[in-house]
């Protein structure tokens, strides 16, 4: 049985998904989505403890996918952190408006990413207790 927390990494760049997976997988089970539509479906079906969401993705962008996850009864409590190369303040504000709890810009420090994943994945556990 796998007792690891699940983190969904949604990014259209395979190398980013693999990099994040390498960083997180010793402590977390990592699920992958290559576009926003896939991210919404996986979040609904797998109920991850955290979603790391890119903004610029095909099918559904990260904002729209974040909004869809946060406005669905099954997935509304899943914390979402935007993981993106778009670092403008307006993008941060829009991410918060869509329901994201954190904003991580690329390039990122692997230790910082792991720390943020630990912190934000535990948000769901704390609210579920």
For the regions a language model picked out, list residue spans one by one:
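Two-component/phosphorelay signaling modules centered on CheY-like receiver
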Residues: 14-31
């Amino acid at each position: 049985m796998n007792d690891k927390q699940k983190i969904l990494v949604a990014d259209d760049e395979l190398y980013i998904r693999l990099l994040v997976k390498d960083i997180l997988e010793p402590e977390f089970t990592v699920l992958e989505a290559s576009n926003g539509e896939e991210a919404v479906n996986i979040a609904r079906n797998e109920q991850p403890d955290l979603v790391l969401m890119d903004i610029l993705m095909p099918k559904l962008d990260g904002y729209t996918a974040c909004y869809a996850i946060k406005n669905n009864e099954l997935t509304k409590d899943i914390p979402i952190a935007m993981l993106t190369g778009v670092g403008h303040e307006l993008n941060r504000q829009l991410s918060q408006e869509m329901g994201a709890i954190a904003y991580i810009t690329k390039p990122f420090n692997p230790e910082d990413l792991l720390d943020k994943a630990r912190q934000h994945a535990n948000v769901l556990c704390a609210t579920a207790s």
